[in-house]
Amino acid sequence: MSYFPWLTIIVVLPIFAGSSIFFFPHRGNKVVRWYTICICLLELLLTTYAFCYHFQLDDPLIQLEEDYKWINIFDFHWRLGIDGLSIGPILLTGFITTLATLAARPVTRDSRLFHFLMLAMYSGQIGSFSSRDLLLFFIMWELELIPVYLLLSMWGGKKRLYSATKFILYTAGGSIFLLMGVPGMGLYGSNEPILNFETSANQSYPLALEIIFYFGFLIAYAVKSPIIPLHTWLPDTHGEAHYSTCMLLAGILLKMGAYGLVRINMELLPHAHSIFSPWLMIVGTIQIIYAASTSSGQSNLKKRIAYSSVSHMGFTIIGIGSITDTGLNGAILQIISHGFIGAALFFLAGTSYDRIRLVYLDEMGGIAIPMPKIFTMFSSFSMASLALPGMSGFVAESVVFWGIITSPKYLLMPKILITFVMAIGMILTPIYSLSMSRQMFYGYKLFNVPNSYFLDSGPRELFVSICIFLPVIGIGIYPDFVLSLSVDKVEAILANYFYK
């Protein structure tokens, strides 16, 4: 056992190192950009080293635990720890944030503030995934909201203030329910607040109170995931944000809601989750169909990709609601898989916009000829998004399917119905995905424009795309690379349920 504070260093390094950016002399953006990339790389290497040498995969208990008394008057502790459920999202956060920083090279206005906000968001996300205390989880949950709001409102499109305001209203409104639930759970049955996850997991609540806690937390996570009908902030936000911010939103931010749903609602409130799980299955199924159908009608490229993200997160919701080892493992695999695919699609959409300055699909066409590298990578990730065999999306969705079919909690006919509707959603996915590629890359519209000349993907864009594509293929070929991280923890969570 290592007593070195690995997790504390991993959580605080980005925001503290980012604070020093403001003391840099005004010598252009290059120094700030490379400093930020080096911090992200150092953070990713530290995380990888700590997990490789100090984390036991076959141990479902919390590891690398840290517990320091922070505020005496509230009995508030700085509690950190990781297990098989959090290690995957933490590594995903480090990987995507590093590549998003590299993708942010075109940002030149207020570069120091921009890169500081990315590093502050990094700390908040890592802190959320590694917190072992309800109040600390809430603080980290809120910490990354302010950087996202500023990134949206200062480095976005024409309607950036509208989308940023809509984002903060939705997320802050959801956080109110989280803020009310955290002290309620901590103070129940005791004058002293009990906020650590382990004690809360062993706490029993009256069923009515547990349902109230569950529903309040569910609203907060439904905004972040997002779950319909609390999803409407997402297309507007993605439509206006810079594509490096979109990478962080699609790759990491959406996954925090699903993580909270498993970590707190499913692990700490098992009886309420058993009651709500059929409704999660129904909502997830509707979400797949609704978002896939709506995506086909979007003319804005980034909004179409945003609705595809909503559709794919429906599989995660269904996997969580299945209450089976296979279904929950599939949901976690889908979290990781879509983190890569969603970030890559937004990155490639942004690099295309940098060249052609068009965002509406009906204005595009024919850019496969002048930009074959972007065409190849975008087509590859579109195939991954529609769950082509051999890629991570196919494995994740197949595992979720199998989890539903084998669930003993549900009768045969509801399982067949849900599986059938999900299959329809998977048929709709190629419709919006392939039509998006056709409208962008095929035809001769832009190619025939007089004096048109578009540069293809450069080394930086190609490097980012390949770095994301390799794990998509790797997980598709060998999914145990991710599943082995969570399988023991999933068994421990489901041991509290009557249906397994």
Swiss-Prot record:
Task: Quote the catalytic activity from the record.
Answer: a plastoquinone + NADH + (n+1) H(+)(in) = a plastoquinol + NAD(+) + n H(+)(out); a plastoquinone + NADPH + (n+1) H(+)(in) = a plastoquinol + NADP(+) + n H(+)(out)
Q: Record keywords: Acyltransferase included? A: no
UniProt-listed PANTHER family: NAD(P)H-QUINONE OXIDOREDUCTASE CHAIN 4, CHLOROPLASTIC (PTHR43507:SF21), NADH-UBIQUINONE OXIDOREDUCTASE CHAIN 4 (PTHR43507)
**Which HAMAP family does the entry mention?**
NDH1_NuoM
Q: Which UniProt keywords apply?
A: Chloroplast, Membrane, NAD, NADP, Plastid, Plastoquinone, Quinone, Thylakoid, Translocase, Transmembrane, Transmembrane helix
Chain segments annotated as coiled-coil in the UniProt record: none
How is the protein disposed in the membrane? Multi-pass membrane protein
- Which family is it part of? Belongs to the complex I subunit 4 family.
The UniProt gene name for this protein comes to: ndhD
Residue spans crossing the bilayer = 4-24, 37-57, 84-104, 111-129, 134-154, 167-187, 208-228, 242-262, 272-292, 305-325, 330-350, 374-396, 416-436, 462-482
Q: What are the annotated GO cellular component locations?
A: chloroplast thylakoid membrane
Cellular compartments annotated: Plastid, Chloroplast thylakoid membrane
What species was this sequence derived from?
Answer: Liriodendron tulipifera
Tell me, which GO biological process terms does this entry list? ATP synthesis coupled electron transport; electron transport coupled proton transport
Q: What is this protein called?
A: NAD(P)H-quinone oxidoreductase chain 4, chloroplastic
Q: Its Enzyme Commission number?
A: 7.1.1.-
Protein origin, superkingdom:
Eukaryota
Q: Name one GO molecular function term.
A: NADH dehydrogenase (ubiquinone) activity
Main location class: plastid
